[in-house]
Amino acid sequence: MGSNEEGNPTNNSDKPSQAAAPEQSNVHVYHHDWAAMQAYYGPRVGIPQYYNSNLAPGHAPPPYMWASPSPMMAPYGAPYPPFCPPGGVYAHPGVQMGSQPQGPVSQSASGVTTPLTIDAPANSAGNSDHGFMKKLKEFDGLAMSISNNKVGSAEHSSSEHRSSQSSENDGSSNGSDGNTTGGEQSRRKRRQQRSPSTGERPSSQNSLPLRGENEKPDVTMGTPVMPTAMSFQNSAGMNGVPQPWNEKEVKREKRKQSNRESARRSRLRKQAETEQLSVKVDALVAENMSLRSKLGQLNNESEKLRLENEAILDQLKAQATGKTENLISRVDKNNSVSGSKTVQHQLLNASPITDPVAAS
């Protein structure tokens, strides 16, 4: 309704300015602080009726002194769901008893359930609903399904009320020229559009199998009502509920993802193992090189020791040969001295017995 309050004074102020334009063609008086006025009053506050753009600007009263303008038309539409009773017997006259085809919800609901497409007389909708609800109140099994259905219809009526309010605001802002004929015509059109849907719910409810008062309701008694209640829920949450093929796709994707994760883990594990092995190989190669260097040093030392040993052996051999030569020379000297003494003794003894022996 704020758009009505905002749009009416501007149009009313523009009309006299347009009418006075031919008369005051040479007079051009404008409000110098128009931007300041717009910033001061804001977009949601209507301009006072006594304000004229062709007159000189004067001191305007503060906004809190303005009286709130009366609404152009009385509010109408369905009340909010908390104000409606759970059973739906004492419903507001403006509330429609049946589900209203509006948007994709009505299309999905009509596609799921066939009782919504059956036409029923709209003149006795309230009386038939009242009597039918009295009959259905005796059954305990159908009470919950009916209340669920009424809750769904109340939610859709509240959504329709909000959409009707938005359309009403648009219509009133577009046609706020002092006449309310456009708003009344749009209201009548909406009422005519909503009137055929009022007879749909009794037809869907009359399709339920009724039993006697003494008979207890079976489990199957609530099944015909479930499509009308569940259709809205399915249509509202159709995107959230996965289909069977969607579940298969999701499972397949999960399986593929798990396979990818396992392959990635195995690849990372193998990569870590190869890195560890490469580190071990590098360590072993370094150790082998160090051992080879030590072995070369030991070979050099052993060669030096062998050469020293050979030199020592040569020296020992030389010393041994010198000693033996000295010994032989000494023996020869001793033998030569003893032989000469015996020869001299024999020559000195001139006896015939010893001469041949000495000669021999």
From Swiss-Prot:
One GO cellular component term: cytoplasm
Compositional bias ranges of the Low complexity kind: 164-184
Gene3D superfamilies: 1.20.5.170
PROSITE patterns per record: BZIP, BZIP_BASIC
Expression by tissue: Found in both light and dark grown leaves.
InterPro entries according to UniProt: bZIP, bZIP_plant_GBF1, bZIP_sf, GBF-like, MFMR
Signal sequence interval, chain numbering: none
SMART domains: BRLZ (SM00338)
Record PANTHER family: G-BOX-BINDING FACTOR 2, G-BOX-BINDING FACTOR 3-RELATED
Family from the record: Belongs to the bZIP family.
Subunit-level organization: DNA-binding heterodimer. Interacts with GBF4. Interacts with BZIP16 and BZIP68.
Record's protein name: G-box-binding factor 2
